[in-house]
C-alpha cells in the first residue's frame, strides 16, 4: 500500500511517497522557505501560501519522474489539514483533493502533530512498541502525551503560555540574530566562553504536574540582556547557552516525571526542537541511567516534511480512515 504525503502547514513544502507494506520511504522532496522569510524575522502567511502554490506541482512532477511511479501506483493521498496557517493548509488540501478527484484516489486528512509524533518511525531501525510517552517540542507546541495505541493519545501536560521553540525564536529576534531561532541559539551556545555568567530560571520544573511555561524564561532573557552593559557577541553566546540549558533542563525533568507517572519505559521525542544536540544528549543520559528506551526522528525529519505526513496517512488509511467527500476542512488550531 503506497501513500503520497503532502505537507504545507507553514513554511515548508513537502512531498513524499511511503510504502506501508515494506515500511519504507520511497521518495522525499522538500522545499524550504526559510530564506524567503528570514528577512522578515518570521513567517509571512501570504507569502508562504503563494510559495506552496508555486512549488507543489513542480515537486510532484519531480518525485514521480525520479521514482518512475505514476498515480496508478498510489493508493491514497495524505495531506496536512491541521493545525497551521489556514491559507497554507488550504493550498495543500486543495492540491490533494484535486489529484484525488482526477485520478480516482482516496484522500485522507492528517493532523500535523500526529505526523511529528510518528516521525521516529522513519528511522528504519526504530521498532517502537506501545505504550510510550511522547514529547512534541517545536516553535508552536510543547506537549507530553501518553500513547497507548495508534490514535489513542492522552495529553499529560503542555505549555500554559509559550512553546519552548518560541522562546528560542523570540530570543534571537531580541539579540538581532537570524531565523529560525532554535538553530541560531544552539550554534551560538556552542561558542559560549563563560558558561556560568548568566543563571536563568527553570519555570515549573519543580511543580508536580507535567505542564510547562516558557514565557517567564523568555522575559528573564529580555531583562538580563537589557541590563547587560556589554552586549557583545561573546555575551550573546553566553546568554544563549544559559537559555538553552534552562529550557532543556525543564524538558528533560518533565519527561522523567511523565515516564515515572505513567510507568512507561519508552520515550519518543519529535518536533523541530528534537534536533537540538544538547536535548538529545541529556535525554540519552536519562535513558541510560534509568534503562529507558528513547526514540528520535532522523535529523532531517525533525522539522516539517512530507515524509511524516505520508507515514501518518498510511497508518490512518490501514486503520480505516479516509475522507468521505470533497469538502475541504482545515483548521488553524486543533488539539491532537
From Swiss-Prot:
Keywords: Acyltransferase, Cytoplasm, Iron, Metal-binding, Transferase, tRNA processing. It is an enzyme of class 2 (transferase). Its EC number is 2.3.1.234. Substrate binds at residues 136-140, 169, 182, 276. The keyword Aminoacyl-tRNA synthetase does not apply. It is found in: Cytoplasm. Binds 1 Fe(2+) ion per subunit. Fe cation binds at residues 112, 116, 304. One of its GO terms (molecular function) is iron ion binding. One of its GO terms (cellular component) is cytoplasm. GO terms for biological process: tRNA threonylcarbamoyladenosine modification. Its cofactor is Fe(2+). InterPro entries: ATPase_NBD, Gcp-like_dom, KAE1/TsaD, TsaD. It comes from the Bacteria. It catalyses: L-threonylcarbamoyladenylate + adenosine(37) in tRNA = N(6)-L-threonylcarbamoyladenosine(37) in tRNA + AMP + H(+). Belongs to the KAE1 / TsaD family. Required for the formation of a threonylcarbamoyl group on adenosine at position 37 (t(6)A37) in tRNAs that read codons beginning with adenine. Is involved in the transfer of the threonylcarbamoyl moiety of threonylcarbamoyl-AMP (TC-AMP) to the N6 group of A37, together with TsaE and TsaB. TsaD likely plays a direct catalytic role in this reaction. PANTHER family: TRNA N6-ADENOSINE THREONYLCARBAMOYLTRANSFERASE, TRNA N6-ADENOSINE THREONYLCARBAMOYLTRANSFERASE, MITOCHONDRIAL. NCBIfam families: gcp_kae1, T6A_TsaD_YgjD. This is tRNA N6-adenosine threonylcarbamoyltransferase. The gene is tsaD.
Amino acid at each position: 500500500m503506497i501513500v503520497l504525503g503532502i505537507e504545507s502547514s507553514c513554511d515548508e513544502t513537502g512531498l513524499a511517497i511511503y510504502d506501508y507494506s515494506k515500511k519504507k520511504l520511497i521518495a522525499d522532496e522538500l522545499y524550504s522557505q526559510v530564506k524567503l522569510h528570514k528577512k522578515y524575522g518570521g513567517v509571512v502567511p501570504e507569502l508562504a501560501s503563494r510559495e506552496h502554490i508555486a512549488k507543489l506541482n513542480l515537486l510532484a512532477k519531480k518525485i514521480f519522474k525520479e521514482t518512475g511511479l505514476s498515480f496508478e501506483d498510489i493508493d491514497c493521498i495524505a495531506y496536512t489539514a491541521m493545525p497551521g496557517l489556514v491559507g497554507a493548509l488550504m493550498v495543500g488540501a486543495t492540491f490533494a483533493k484535486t489529484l484525488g478527484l482526477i485520478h480516482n484516489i482516496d484522500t485522507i486528512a492528517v493532523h500535523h502533530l500526529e505526523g511529528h509524533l510518528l516521525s521516529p518511525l522513519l528511522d528504519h531501525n526504530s521498532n517502537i512498541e506501545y505504550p510510550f510517552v511522547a514529547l512534541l517540542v517545536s516553535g508552536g507546541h510543547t506537549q507530553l502525551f501518553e500513547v497507548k495505541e495508534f490514535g489513542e493519545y492522552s495529553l499529560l501536560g503542555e505549555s500554559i503560555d509559550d512553546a519552548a521553540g518560541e522562546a528560542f525564536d523570540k530570543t534571537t529576534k531580541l539579540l538581532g540574530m537570524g531565523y529560525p531561532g532554535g538553530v541560531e541559539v544552539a550554534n551560538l551556545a556552542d561558542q559560549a566562553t563563560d558558561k556560568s555568567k548568566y543563571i536563568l530560571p527553570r519555570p515549573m520544573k519543580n511543580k508536580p504536574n507535567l505542564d510547562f511555561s516558557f514565557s517567564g524564561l523568555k522575559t528573564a532573557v529580555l531583562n538580563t540582556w537589557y541590563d547587560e552593559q556589554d552586549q557583545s557577541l561573546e555575551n550573546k553566546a553566553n546568554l544563549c547557552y544559559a537559555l538553552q540549558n534552562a529550557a532543556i533542563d525543564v524538558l528533560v525533568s518533565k519527561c522523567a516525571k511523565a515516564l515515572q507517572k505513567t510507568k512507561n519505559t519508552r520515550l519518543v521525542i519529535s518536533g523541530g526542537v528534537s534536533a537540538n544536540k544538547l536535548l538529545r544528549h541529556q535525554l540519552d543520559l536519562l535513558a541510560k541511567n534509568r534503562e529507558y528506551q528513547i526514540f528520535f526522528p532522523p535529523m532531517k525529519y525533525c522539522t516539517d516534511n512530507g515524509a511524516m505526513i505520508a507515514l501518518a496517512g498510511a497508518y490512518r488509511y490501514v486503520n480505516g480512515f479516509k475522507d468521505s467527500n470533497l469538502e475541504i476542512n482545515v483548521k488553524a488550531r486543533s488539539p491532537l
